[in-house]
Amino acid sequence: MSVKISGKDYAGMYGPTKGDRVRLADTDLIIEIEEDYTVYGDECKFGGGKSIRDGMGQSPSAARDDKVLDLVITNAIIFDTWGIVKGDIGIKDGKIAGIGKAGNPKVMSGVSEDLIIGASTEVITGEGLIVTPGGIDTHIHFICPQQIETALFSGITTMIGGGTGPADGTNATTCTPGAFNIRKMLEAAEDFPVNLGFLGKGNASFETPLIEQIEAGAIGLKLHEDWGTTPKAIDTCLKVADLFDVQVAIHTDTLNEAGFVENTIAAIAGRTIHTYHTEGAGGGHAPDIIKIASRMNVLPSSTNPTMPFTVNTLDEHLDMLMVCHHLDSKVKEDVAFADSRIRPETIAAEDILHDMGVFSMMSSDSQAMGRVGEVIIRTWQTAHKMKLQRGALPGEKSGCDNIRAKRYLAKYTINPAITHGISQYVGSLEKGKIADLVLWKPAMFGVKPEMIIKGGFIIAGRMGDANASIPTPQPVIYKNMFGAFGKAKYGTCVTFVSKASLENGVVEKMGLQRKVLPVQGCRNISKKYMVHNNATPEIEVDPETYEVKVDGEIITCEPLKVLPMAQRYFLF
């Protein structure tokens, strides 16, 4: 016997289904569910009088070794770069076991082979919630450890960068220089509830000082103009990276002291490189570093202070620059240096280049001209701004924004994972990958997560008064959960290191308790590997007016006065 119910009632009980549309926060962005993996009438739902009970949705006999899940998230909106679907997410041994229909195959139709619910299974009710991969921020200045919780509570689960604390070198550059400092940061990483990887200092004209940092555990090298990003340093750094299969990130020469953007391109010589803040306000050849994004070997990212372009963007940048790069407002040359980096024309073009899929990644530049807790917010604010100013993207289905949404999600999930050689572990919701997931209420999407899961276990979330009779009374604030404590965090979180440091036993000698995994596949990639963000048009910059042209056409946009995902979400 079947029962018919309205779409509204169905969505209220089991969440939206195929063809239903959901607004992301208070933006103008709408996503549509493309497929529903659940089976109508056999949905899994937990609670009093619901279906996940012994002999019903829960197998009465299946033991944990019989492919029974450790955790299932039911009826969720699964939002990833490969699709926007409705279904159940199964997690086992800290990894994603599958996405599809979960339940008890003895009495339910269509249950996926690897998604059996049994007595060993915990349940999170995902009805009406959006689930995304944990975010990845690849431009971290590790200035203070408090950044890590701030990032985690915003939905970031992996942080890559460099630093040693509030040293002037760290304030300005994203480097953990030398074996001693790398070891100390790897040891410190043991205590933090996110995945971590550290970049060594890449500025050296000879190979030995760079090799010893990779062998000490650095997952890559960072070239920064404050250390002297000369053509020789660039070439040497990339030679070492090719030798050890690690990534190079670069902040180029704003002052054009050792050469211009063409000289840097020549020094890179077609080798793969991650260009930080490729627009240039964060640093790089003035005024035309943005041109480098047209190269197939260049993996370009933005940092969030210029994203999106608003009426306040220019005013706040000068003071940020003076502090971060140890400049003196009384020295006219220092002021001129700062002024040369702040160009409204290239900042306006940056928004459009993201929307075109030319810029591939978003990151923070934490406490060094960027906000570590706003990578995800700024990404979706930019997507909203571009929809307002540019309309629907080519190929978009009328009334929804799936193409644009997937493009922007990729900028802080799968693309940074591919760039830094960790996409086999994290960056997407796919079978076999580490279960780093973020759950959102649609109204809070991109701003305030409901819950963060790391390595298949709840590690952080919104929580009310601990003395209350139920979990929801105010004050509701973000708190670390059990996955962030004791020995649990050694299994829920990963430290990424170079393959060389594992093979030479350096990491083993440190006695690290966290799971340690090698980066790989950093040197054989190019822009074409950047999911939904692999465009390589010709980019030109007028040296006098700073106007940006893409394939011969000027691109620009107006700054916004009002953004979504802003004050109304942060009244308390």
Swiss-Prot record:
Modified how: Carboxylation allows a single lysine to coordinate two nickel ions.
PROSITE patterns: UREASE_2, UREASE_3
Reaction equations catalysed: urea + 2 H2O + H(+) = hydrogencarbonate + 2 NH4(+)
Catalytic site positions: H325
GO cellular component, one term: cytoplasm
Residues noted as binding substrate in the record, renumbered to the chain: H224
Cofactor note: Binds 2 nickel ions per subunit.
InterPro entries to which the protein is assigned, alphabetical: Amidohydro-rel, Metal-dep_hydrolase_composite, Metal_Hydrolase, Urease_alpha_N_dom, Urease_alpha_subunit, Urease_AS, Urease_asu, Urease_asu_c
Annotated compartments: Cytoplasm
Associated pathway: Nitrogen metabolism; urea degradation; CO(2) and NH(3) from urea (urease route): step 1/1
PANTHER family the UniProt entry points to: UREASE (PTHR43440:SF1)
Similarity comment text for this entry: Belongs to the metallo-dependent hydrolases superfamily. Urease alpha subunit family.
NCBIfam families: PRK13206.1, PRK13207.1, urease_alph
HAMAP family per record: Urease_alpha
Protein name: Urease subunit alpha
Species, as recorded: Acetivibrio thermocellus (strain ATCC 27405 / DSM 1237 / JCM 9322 / NBRC 103400 / NCIMB 10682 / NRRL B-4536 / VPI 7372)
Gene: ureC
